[in-house]
């Protein structure tokens, strides 16, 4: 028989009031008190202080791209375009980050992969700032506002894997069809709701005005730890 499990413990948020509001939104039970709690955080003309590392969560790729490019243009210094190395069969729709990653000193970036080394210095969704670019050595130095140690970032390789069943040996085997190599980073002044799934941010600006699907706003709000 099928076993049903219900996950009840919330790890992302710890504030009981915030958890209650999120649950009421999910269950379509939002009351006036919940609305007042949400509206208390609405600031139409809000502009974050420089280096506060807010990230804007929005509904469309074009809006996230526009914000990222506008913020990148505000930075002085040379723009560096880093091309990914794609080998064999790796479909463009499956690229984990931009094929051409555009960076500048001071750019706000987000890691898109967990650190698999022993030190675990970064994780998927961690936000930092580009401090040095040494592309001749294929290195980017990223610093963090939380005081954690700077990280020298190198290219990572993703594999396009096909799984097949080996009947003779009764086991599943992997076949690597192609690879994608790029720095595990993306510009992070803004990101879409879709790409923020599973991530947690300490500071976020929620752009709810262009949400078009049921549950999008609640999904945005749940990205924020509190």
PLM feature spans:
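Conserved helicase motor core of P-loop NTPases
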Residues: 1-120, 131-135
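C-terminal accessory regions
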Residues: 110-148, 152-226
